[in-house]
Regions:
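Conserved hydrophobic "DFG−1" position in protein kinase catalytic cores
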Residues: 6, 37, 46, 110-111, ...
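Short solvent-exposed loop/turn micro-motifs enriched in small/polar/acidic residues
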Residues: 28-30, 92, 125
């Protein structure tokens, strides 16, 4: 049974937790993370959700909810490792964006890792496939409805900044 800590919209801890699946009171939030893994060639790692999950079959970046007692960065490191087997340190995460929605403080991170697909250890309960794609291909996939809404929104809101980050990775 997982519990999530609750916060105000300004991230002040409320000192309360809620069980996964329970309604979150209006004006209260829990932390959700997304991690976009980019390799030194500028390719983005996508994982495909298993068919039986919400948005089954859609492609996404690693992510999930911070459990009680976890910081956003700790959750990002844990989710990336659980879903792909990729190890990252908190200080390797580049904070890219935060989106506040109905009940979520959704933190988006970028991490640079060169990991061949053959070295990934996919969490079979959540992920059924993985692939490296260019930013242009990711845009195409989002337009065709092949990505989760979260990825599509990230591209829509922050695509230019992601392009700059990728150029920085490739050329620096």
């Amino acid at each position: 049974m997982e519990f999530f800590d609750l916060y105000t919209s300004t991230r002040r801890p409320l000192g309360r937790s809620v069980m996964r699946g329970a309604p979150i009171p209006r004006g209260e939030y829990h932390i959700v993370v997304q991690v976009m893994t980019i390799n030194s060639s500028g390719k983005i790692l996508l994982t495909q959700r298993v068919p039986q999950k919400t948005s089954g079959g859609k492609w996404e970046c690693s992510g999930g909810c911070a459990v009680s007692g976890e910081t956003s960065r700790q959750a990002a490191v844990r989710e990336l490792f659980e879903e792909t087997g990729i190890r990252a340190e908190e200080d390797e995460l580049i904070p890219e964006w935060t989106l506040t929605t109905d009940s979520m403080l959704r933190d988006f991170y970028v991490v640079v890792k060169d990991v061949p697909l053959s070295k990934l250890h996919l969490q079979t309960a959540e992920v059924c496939a993985a692939k490296w794609v260019s930013l242009e291909r990711l845009y195409e996939m989002a337009r065709m409805g092949q990505t989760t809404r979260t990825v599509a929104r990230w591209l829509d809101q922050r695509g230019d900044q992601l392009g700059d980050i990728i150029k920085d990775i490739i050329y620096n």
